[in-house]
Amino acid sequence: MNVSWFGPAATSTHPASIPVIGVRTRLIKLGLTAQGTLQVPASTSVAGWYTGGPRPGQVGSAVIAGHIDSYLGPGVFFRLRLLRPGDRVYIRQAGGKLAVFRVYAEHSYRKDHFPTQRVYGPAPDPELRLITCGGTFDPAIGSYLNNVVVYAAQIR
């Protein structure tokens, strides 16, 4: 599974923050491209939530994607690969409730071996999957060869 480079101009949802890596972003809504891959935000400065899955804080694997960088510089998830088990992710939900997630794993996968079921599949409790590009940048295809995925479970 690959993420596409550009996503739609979409309405905002609620803000997210990852203080340990300096992320504070609004979340836009993301769907799928015509090819069936996850859209990503058109802007490198915001992250997006995949509306085909649960909302952050609902039971299951909520997927949030953002860019690592662009020709303009670092993107919202530039430092995502630096997250370690125990780090916290905060999502402000509808009604103002703050959901807190604890990172439990970080992996880098080749895009041609992306574990779609592990990332998008069911989870018994509310979890997050934070996704960005990583690995080596291939200028011939204009894309990174890997995806970095951070796994986090809701603790509050």
Predicted features and spans:
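Solvent-exposed, non-transmembrane regions of membrane-associated and secreted proteins
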Residues: 1-84, 90-100, 105-156
